[in-house]
Amino acid sequence: MGVTKKPDLNDPVLRAKLAKGMGHNYYGEPAWPNDLLYIFPVVILGTIACNVGLAVLEPSMVGEPADPFATPLEILPEWYFFPVFQILRTVPNKLLGVLLMVSVPAGLLTVPFLENVNKFQNPFRRPVATTVFLIGTAVALWLGIGATLPIDKSLTLGLF
């Protein structure tokens, strides 16, 4: 089952465009052989050359050896877990923290169903979904930045 928008052939504007040949892909240059034989290998080899050059010129240091008997002062998760880590760190009740963690994917699952009756794909014509996305992004950035700060400055980011 695919979700594709079918064109409304009764629309006079669309019929006028199709009559002029604007609805078909007759413009531009073909992907074969121009892109696939000449441009893509140059881009791939250039990317490999940049990676090898960076690896040779700026090798990453191994760092200090691990000491199993010394625990670091603060253990931080990977960067993509910072917002959820901040939720767990600031909420005093463990059950509430776990429920808030579960609400993150549950909230993400509801976003496509907001304004799903709207036929427009332009985000400016879907104000509710766009607002939910922008507020969610701002909250995730706020929590992610706050997770890197000490607990007393984490919610205000040291600004207030």
Curated annotation (Swiss-Prot):
The keyword Chloroplast applies. SUPFAM superfamilies: a domain/subunit of cytochrome bc1 complex (Ubiquinol-cytochrome c reductase). Pfam families: Cytochrom_B_C. GO terms for molecular function: electron transporter, transferring electrons within cytochrome b6/f complex of photosystem II activity; electron transporter, transferring electrons within the cyclic electron transport pathway of photosynthesis activity; oxidoreductase activity. It is found in: Plastid, Chloroplast thylakoid membrane. GO terms for biological process: photosynthetic electron transport chain. It is a multi-pass membrane protein. GO terms for cellular component: chloroplast thylakoid membrane. The chain crosses the membrane at residues 36-56, 95-115, 131-151. Keywords: Chloroplast, Electron transport, Membrane, Photosynthesis, Plastid, Thylakoid, Transmembrane, Transmembrane helix, Transport. Its main location: plastid. InterPro entries: Cyt_b/b6_C, Cyt_b/b6_C_sf, Cyt_b6/f_cplx_suIV, Cytochrome_b_C_euk/bac. NCBIfam families: cytb6_f_IV. HAMAP family: Cytb6_f_subIV. The 4 large subunits of the cytochrome b6-f complex are cytochrome b6, subunit IV (17 kDa polypeptide, petD), cytochrome f and the Rieske protein, while the 4 small subunits are petG, petL, petM and petN. The complex functions as a dimer. Component of the cytochrome b6-f complex, which mediates electron transfer between photosystem II (PSII) and photosystem I (PSI), cyclic electron flow around PSI, and state transitions. Belongs to the cytochrome b family. PetD subfamily. PANTHER family: CYTOCHROME B (PTHR19271:SF16). This is Cytochrome b6-f complex subunit 4. It comes from Coffea arabica. The gene is petD.
